[in-house]
From Swiss-Prot:
The lineage of its organism: Bacteria, Pseudomonadati, Pseudomonadota, Alphaproteobacteria, Rhodospirillales. Disruption phenotype: Still forms magnetite crystals, which are about half the size of wild-type but have a wild-type surface. It comes from Paramagnetospirillum magneticum (strain ATCC 700264 / AMB-1). This is Magnetosome protein Mms5. Belongs to the magnetosome MamD/Mms5 family. Disulfide bonds: none annotated.
Length: 51
């Protein structure tokens, strides 16, 4: 089941055991970016009315 290369996701990225860690970091960063985008997008009309 496990090859001599060690634990990997099998995505062909050559990251080995760091693959899941890197994907997790990228996923969290993407979620934070999307949250900030939607939060700022929804806040724009209120900011425009205040001017």
């Amino acid at each position: 089941m496990l090859s001599a290369k060690g634990v990997s996701l099998g995505l062909g990225l050559g990251l080995g055991a760091w693959g899941p860690v890197l994907l997790g970091v990228v996923g969290v960063a993407g979620a934070i970016a999307l949250y900030g985008y939607y939060k700022n997008r929804n806040a724009e009309p209120a900011a425009a009315e205040a001017v």
